[in-house]
Amino acid sequence: FIKLFSGLKENFGQIKLHAKVEFDKERNKIKPEYIWSKQPIQPTHYQQHLEGKISIGIQPCTKDGKASFGCIDVDPENYKDFNIVLLLSYIEKYKLPLVPCRSKSGGLHIYLFLTEAISAQTMRDALASILLPLELKRTTEIYPKQIELEPDEHGNMSGNFINLPYFNHTKTKRYALDKNNTALSLEQFIKIALASRVSPNELDQLITRVDTEILMGGDPEFEDGPPCLQRLSKTKIGDGRDRFMFNYMVFAKKKYKENWPDKVNEANKYFSVPWPL
């Protein structure tokens, strides 16, 4: 567990367990209070987390700007209607070496583990590429959030930490999920997470493979355009027509210059139900 979640060692985050917890009624989300411990992380802190004595968070970015794990923080607009099964199906479809865990607030933390540390920037770039096959917005939060850390006025390294799974592991609500949306024990999680780790070279190959699979079969019109349009053009679009048309207009203005309004009129061919022009 410690090996998997090894990041910044000079500081770690905590949830104030006994503080008053807010609840966001609009999003059906718990909003606890967070603090930085302002002390180095020790093995005993991980153990206390698993025992439910403290709830810790780790900054994936080290003081050297490296990261051996990263996380996509899926924070839906409304937790009540959150479709976890659909996300799990995308992970399975593209054979992604990701480990999804329920988050404290009821969302999903999707972890990527590496056999050795890479630059925090490279980790962020890789996770940003993985957003596309998961059908997640480009604005989805990615950890590490920082690619380098600067000490504050007291000399403490901080930035942003990610809350770890398996707090109070025997009764936890922050558990990993298998492809069938079944909760995994701590022991099962560790075994699967260790087996899922990829090397930096394997990560490069993974991103190339996934990009190719997503874009293959898209309309040739978008070969020099944004991947999102090429991917969406593979099937008739039902939902999200407004978003597609906005992106298409930006694309058409750049590619077709004076002729772009005519191309926008022809874009209805991509929809199952015509967009009102």
Give short role names for the model-derived ranges.
Residues 1, 72, 164, 249, ...:
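A residue-level signal for conserved active-site and pocket-lining positions in enzyme catalytic cores
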Residues 73-129:
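Structured, beta-strand-rich domain cores
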Residues 72, 89-90, 94-97, 169-171, ...:
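Catalytic residues for metal-mediated phosphoryl-transfer on nucleic acids/nucleotides
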Residues 50-58, 90-98, 231-237:
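Short amphipathic beta-strand starts and helix->beta connectors
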Residues 77, 107-123, 160, 168-173, ...:
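Modules that initiate DNA replication and primer synthesis
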Residues 58-62, 98-105, 141-145, 154:
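Short beta-strand
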Residues 1-69, 77-87, 158-161, 166-169:
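DNA replication initiation on ssDNA origins
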Residues 124-174:
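Aromatic- and Lys/Arg-enriched surface recognition patch
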